Regions:
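A structural "domain/chain start" motif
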Residues: 1-60, 70, 74, 103, ...
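Surface-exposed short loop/turn segments
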Residues: 9, 49-54, 59-108, 117-132, ...
Length: 151
């Protein structure tokens, strides 16, 4: 027979051996300047909101999350049949990142060509900036999800 106490474990989704993380500004290979600042700010905001980790300076941090924006791209999904004006576009951001324990040198998480994208509608007065900002926010949430402990 199953014992009730042998079922689920109630514990945090995040590593319990980490309390602090440094998040330097992501570097970029993209010509879309400024996205690295938006992304870094969004990651810091999401770490503080979603996880038990505190973002601190590198000299006080248990871990460091570093990354590089590899590409920022816009794809047109649909155009107006008569004018060829884009009606629906996708803004995508591709990053490489590594989360490392500064105390041991151990890599806690590493991802290459990690991408998040968001649809936006220029014909509804949504600009490329709107698409980029939405992609940045989605990407920040996804990166913080990757900082959860392995099951």
């Amino acid at each position: 027979a199953l014992q009730p106490q042998s079922g689920y474990k109630w514990k945090t989704l995040y590593r319990e051996d980490v309390r602090t993380v440094a998040v330097p500004i992501f570097t970029t290979k993209s010509f879309h300047q400024g996205v690295e600042f938006q992304l870094t700010k969004a990651i810091v905001t999401q770490i503080e909101a979603m996880s038990p980790y505190k973002v601190v300076d590198r000299d006080r941090a248990d871990t460091i999350l570093e990354g590089e924006i590899v590409d920022v791209r816009t794809r047109t999904v649909s155009r107006d049949r008569d004018s060829a004006v884009p009606q629906e576009q996708i803004q995508g951001i591709v990053v490489n990142f590594v989360w490392k324990d500064l105390r041991t040198g151990k890599i806690l998480q590493q991802k290459y060509n990690f991408e998040e994208s968001k649809v936006f509608y220029p014909t509804l007065a949504e600009s490329q900036f709107t698409g980029t900002q939405s992609s940045v926010e989605n990407l920040a949430v996804s990166i913080v999800h990757e900082m959860q402990a392995d099951w």
